A protein has these predicted regions:
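Auxiliary tRNA-acceptor-end handling modules of aminoacyl-tRNA synthetases
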Residues: 1-195
Length: 196
């Protein structure tokens, strides 16, 4: 019904949390069809909606679920198209079973969650993406106004900008004593290496 359609549309909308583009999964068309179905369902006609409209919505939802599931399970880009000698093979996933389970339980989020990679690297990437989006929403990265390449031993406002920028990315810290925030010391050099 429309509750499941809205639940799937919301899950597609959150696919950006996995680094995916929600519009790649027909989100705009799904919302358009869903609005038309809901509008027709509100009428008091003996036949309150067109079956073809429901069929279109069902097809779009099914295709979106299967495509999103495939991308969550195996990635959006086939690595063999980038590197012909790629050795890592993704695990096989039965997308029709995933669709059946999601449809029968109505728990779209759990069904999609089971398809995500379970290794820590994937979780770390999702967390980093969330932090970057928060940083962007807050105005973005602090800029480093350096006119030339900075080196250990340099001193000046650009060094302070660099230190602040590396603090924002989590690559530098202010624990311990720093005598001069504008001095490019060994701790800042180590932070630059971590960042790189």
């Amino acid at each position: 019904g429309t509750l499941t359609a809205r639940t799937l549309a919301a899950a597609i909308g959150r696919s950006h949390e996995d680094g995916l583009a929600p519009l790649d999964y027909h989100l705009d068309l799904i919302y358009d069809l869903l609005a038309r179905v809901l509008k027709q369902s509100g009428k008091h006609d003996p036949l309150p909606f067109e079956p073809a409209l429901w069929a279109d919505l069902d097809l779009m939802l099914t295709d979106a679920f299967v495509l999103l599931s495939a991308h969550l399970a195996a990635g959006r880009v086939n690595p063999e198209t980038l590197h012909s000698d790629w050795k890592i093979k993704p695990g096989s996933v039965d997308l029709s079973t995933a669709l059946d389970q999601a449809a029968s339980s109505g728990d779209i989020d759990t069904a999609l969650g089971r398809l995500r990679p379970v290794h820590q690297g994937y979780t770390d990437l999702r967390d980093a993406l969330a932090r970057l989006r928060e940083l962007k929403a807050a105005g973005g990265w602090p800029t480093v106004a350096a006119r030339q390449t900075l080196h250990p031993g340099d001193h000046g406002p650009a060094v302070g900008d660099l230190r602040f920028r590396l603090l924002a990315s989590g690559d530098a810290d202010l624990t311990g004593r720093i005598d001069d925030l504008l001095y490019f010391d060994s701790r800042l050099a180590a932070a630059v290496k971590r960042f790189q």
